[in-house]
From Swiss-Prot:
Keywords: Hydrolase, Magnesium, Metal-binding, Nucleotide metabolism. It holds the Pfam family dUTPase. GO terms for biological process: dUMP biosynthetic process; dUTP catabolic process. Its EC number is 3.6.1.23. It comes from Cronobacter sakazakii (strain ATCC BAA-894). This is Deoxyuridine 5'-triphosphate nucleotidohydrolase. Substrate binds at residues 71-73, 84, 88-90, 98. This enzyme is involved in nucleotide metabolism: it produces dUMP, the immediate precursor of thymidine nucleotides and it decreases the intracellular concentration of dUTP so that uracil cannot be incorporated into DNA.
Length: 152
């Protein structure tokens, strides 16, 4: 059964002046989020800013969450990434989706109204249950970490 998620449009320009979020291809996992701005924003090297998306979300189902991820082209070509690296949207959050952007590049970057700035992916959630134990059942790896399995 397909799950439905309530995404509210807060800014009347979404769907009119700015396209609704869509999946770019049939295999796309992420929906593009756009900067709902009245005017361009210049992001100088090293600067961060919060950008509104014009969308609010309430996932409601605790077995789901959303993550906001950078768009690969912005980071690779321009050095513009998410200020918090990944945004996590819990199922009980009900506010506007804001995107923190950070210019880690060497040049100023201008964000235009309606520009695609990030992508949102819905993911399943598994919550951990903690149990106090004395030890674990032994495995071949044991406590080996940080390069334990080698490079080749």
């Amino acid at each position: 059964m397909m799950k439905k998620i309530d995404v509210k449009i807060l800014d009347p320009r979404v769907g009119e002046q700015f396209p609704l979020p869509t999946y770019a291809t049939s295999g796309s996992a992420g929906l593009d989020l756009r900067a709902c701005l009245d005017e361009s924003v210049e992001l100088t090297p090293g600067a961060t800013t919060l950008l509104p998306t014009g969308l609010a979300i309430h996932i409601a189902d605790p077995s789901l969450a959303a993550v906001i991820l950078p768009r690969s082209g912005l980071g690779h070509k321009h050095g513009v990434v998410l200020g918090n690296l990944v945004g996590l949207i819990d199922s009980d959050y009900q506010g506007q989706l804001m995107v923190s952007v950070w210019n880690r590049g060497q040049q100023s970057f201008t964000i235009e109204p309606g520009e695609r700035i990030a992508q949102m992916v819905f993911v399943p959630v598994v919550q951990a249950e903690f149990n106090l134990v004395e030890d674990f059942t032994a495995t071949d790896r044991g406590e080996g970490g940080f390069g334990h399995s080698g490079r080749k």
